[in-house]
Amino acid sequence: MSSQSAYQLPISFRKSNQLSFAPAVRQYISNKYDQHPDMFRQDIEVIDALRRDAINVREPHTSGIRKLQAYAAQLVWISGKFPIDIGADFTWYPALGYNTDRPLVQNNLQYELLNVLYNLAALYCQLALSTNSNGDSNAIKTAANYFSHAAGVLSHMKTAVLPELRMPSPPEDMDEATLESLEQLMLAQCQECYWQKAVAEGYKDATIAKLAARASDLYNSAAEAAMKSEAISSAWIHHISAKHHHFAAAAQYRASLDCLEKRKYGEEIARLQDAVACANEGLREARGGYLKEGVAEDLRRLKMRAEEDLKRAEHDNDMLYLLPVPTKPELKILDRANLAVARIPAQVSAPVDHIGDEAEFGPALFSKLVPYAVHMAVSIYEERRDRLVNNNIIHELEVLTERMHEILSSLNLPGSLQALEKPLGLPGPLIQHAEEIRQADGINRIQRSFADIDKLRSSDIAVFEEGKSLLVTEEEEDQRLRRRHGTQRWARPESRQDPAGGQKLWAQVGEIEGYFASSTSSDGIVREKYLAIEDTLMVLSGSDRSLMDFVPSSRRTEIPESVKPALGRLRGAYNDVLRMESRRRKRVEALRERARSDDIKPDILRETGRLERAYPGTTLAAAHFDDFFERRLDSLYEDDLALLERETAEQEKCLNEVSRVNREFESQRRAAGADKAGGKEREAALQKLDSAFYKYKEIVSNVEVGRKFYNDLSKIVGTFRDTCRTWVAERRKDARSLEDEISMPPLGSLSLQQTPSQQSSQYYSQQQQQQPRSPPQEAHHSAYADTGSMPPQQPRPLPAANAQQTWSQNMPIQFGGPPGTAQQTQPAQAGAKKPVGGTWDPSAGIRFG
């Protein structure tokens, strides 16, 4: 029996980036700390070691179970001591869906826990698949146990962790529908293991039918949940649906064998008919090439066996038994035997019980930490390597190829050759080009790519606009407060001149807007390219008949003898160009593969050890590896850089030869009159189709570059938005502190005769009235000045009704009278003593005598 593990679906691991945690009493930013072991506290070392171990689990080995469980348990433990937004930005790449290269960054402990548990479920799943590859009974039982634990972990994530996530929306590949689908899939594959074991050990057909029926139910539940998920791919949905129909057919087939044994010949026929129908339904899922060949082949074999038995059963029943065949609604529904149960490991359901000095997941599992600068250096090297390979080598080679095709197109090649060599029908290269576009679903592929790019650009713009709006709002708030309090008192830099972040952020606004402007222009150019060839691509992606209708036949079917020598030389020169292009394409693919396999980690760790020995006590930084990077890049890619010069020279030589031979060919063709008799129209049509094909290849390359650009830009705008949030929060906090400082009453306004409540009332009265008189500071000074030195103010004429408001020595002192009365008060006893000029202002305090 072939192993079923090859036909079961694995859950892939989610990938993450390195970071460090914060101590219990403060937030700790991953890119601000020094990773030298002597400078870390023990708890930081422990949690960093646990996380590093957990995120590096990438292979189905049992040692990874403890690593993931220990880290998950530690996360649960520290979530009781720290807030959920601990201050560490956890970056994880999705494992499902169509954005697996686009990470999601969250400052959220529950998000980190959800990812770690997801990887634990993936590990259980992959262990099940690797264990079941042997096919023996004990291995199958162990695989079923692993699938059961995978389902249990997914169930725990869905019911215990996801509700506590505290995010606006969960990641699309870990939402409730996706987790439900994965849980049901794990249970289905667990049930399939028990079914496989029963078949291998020769259980009764009735028992095997019950096991298969339950497996079919579980696959159906997984498919229904997958339809509600945005992350489960179409290929997975087709696979799961096919397995649902497969096990439904297998259940009915085994039930038919049981009926045969019990001499229920009519029911046997009905169940065989249903088995064939279910197998046909499963085979429909194979359309479009979604299924693995082994899955489809199993369905075909099952269908063939059921059809053979059905033919035999119908013949026997018609000739011998003559029993009625029940309809499908009349058939008794098969019983189910459910052996697949979601079992949550105790280390996951009660993790804190396994933490402690003497417990299973004790602290200080690892003491050695790799400096963070090394991880940064690896990223810097990979960025430099990719820039060197993609921009300096591959891009230049692609430019050479594009220039080559432009020159060939200007020479009407290969159209002029094909029109003369094959005056009737379709040339072979054209048929190959058309088939390639059809197989790739070229037009829909480009349109989907355009839609993806639009979606990515809109998402990036939305994130950027969110950050920019924060800056604009903060600037408006700052200007409003500056106008309210005055420039002298609002003594802090304006938003765009703030050296603490405003200058850099507003400069980034211009840079990112420039990115969007240039990318929008590039997108427009690519779309114009596509629109220019869309009609021709429609012809290429159509049938051969439509191609033949597009390409007219030449009325001359024989090549003139005088043209044949020049034609042969031109064909040879053109073939040299094609061979050169083919060699170049293979070299580019080999270079890409070499760059992908260029793993610097072992070498950079050795270089780290050398630097630490050479410079003891020095904190390593990424800049220390610059010379090492240069030496490595030169040794690995110097020959490829030299290849550019050779390719340029070779192409120039080949194209010069093609141009020379083409002139001879055109001259001979005109002399022989071979460019007439319908040849020009055929040549133009063939050339148009050939040019459209190479433009199509160019557009496909362009849209892939565009997609990568917007994915990379999403990281930039995401960091920009998060930095804006932090900076704006700090500016607002600073503004509140400055406003509180300004709101404190000046010392000159305090008087020993006033109670604190009177002083406060006086101050706020000043702030609210904003009288167009001397500033409060001047009024306070005048209250303590020599009265003889003050020039008398001209008393304001008062109406009689207000005379009673004038203060005299025989009247009590009144504060804050009706509006307008305080400013009109003047001394009434002018003759009793020398009057002091000025009207009384509450803001000036009280002056006696």
Curated annotation (Swiss-Prot):
Domain BRO1 as annotated: residue spans: 7-404
Assembly mode: Interacts with RIM101 by binding to its two YPX[LI] motifs.
Location of the region described as Disordered in the Swiss-Prot/TrEMBL record: 475-502, 738-849
Origin: domain of life: Eukaryota
One GO location term (cellular component): endosome
Biased composition regions of type Polar residues, renumbered to the chain: 802-812
Species, as recorded: Pyricularia oryzae (strain 70-15 / ATCC MYA-4617 / FGSC 8958)
Designated name of the protein: pH-response regulator protein palA/RIM20
InterPro entries, alphabetized: ALIX_V_dom (IPR025304), BRO1_dom (IPR004328), BRO1_sf (IPR038499)
UniProt keyword list: Coiled coil
PROSITE patterns to which the protein is assigned, alphabetical: BRO1
Entry coiled-coil feature ranges: 260-321
Functional description taken from the UniProt entry: Required for the proteolytic cleavage of the transcription factor RIM101 in response to alkaline ambient pH. May act as a scaffold protein that recruits the calpain-like protease RIM13 via VPS32 to its substrate RIM101.
Gene (UniProt): RIM20
